[in-house]
């Protein structure tokens, strides 16, 4: 009888990126994937996590903001999480195993490039820096962080600051 062999499947986080045509030459897909990946890993997200990133314009994000938040104005970033339950404690230590061929789709982060550009100018830093910040912010929302209350806002800001330090070399 042949010896028993264990097969270990190593998965990686799947990050899907769509950059709308007017912004394709302005934003690097590998840059976005690195930022998202480092943020997810720093938060100990499940290695089977999957997320989508969309870079779009003012009109599309304004339409989404109106449809889903009731605000008839553009915004910088929107996060749409896809999990049925609040993803607050979604980490690699979760008791429920995910089959090796299934990813946990956290959701979508949608960023307005023109809004990021405006905010970068106002803050006197690069558009890449602003996009990284907005992406981190969006990913943290998908992981259950929020900023509607003072304490929660402080916690989220702390995680954003830590993530920005982790990606500093990517921005240079």
From Swiss-Prot:
Record note on cofactor: Binds 1 zinc ion.
Binding site for Zn(2+): 137, 141, 147
Record InterPro entries: MetalPrtase_cat_dom_sf_prd, YbeY, YbeY_CS
Subcellular location: Cytoplasm
Cofactors: Zn(2+)
GO terms for cellular component: cytoplasm
Annotated EC: 3.1.-.-
One Pfam family, short name: YbeY
Keywords: Cytoplasm, Endonuclease, Hydrolase, Metal-binding, Nuclease, Ribosome biogenesis, rRNA processing, Zinc
Biological-process GO terms, alphabetical: rRNA processing
Main location: cytoplasm
One MF term in the entry's GO annotations: RNA endonuclease activity
Described function: Single strand-specific metallo-endoribonuclease involved in late-stage 70S ribosome quality control and in maturation of the 3' terminus of the 16S rRNA.
Family: Belongs to the endoribonuclease YbeY family.
Protein name: Endoribonuclease YbeY
Gene name linked to the record: ybeY
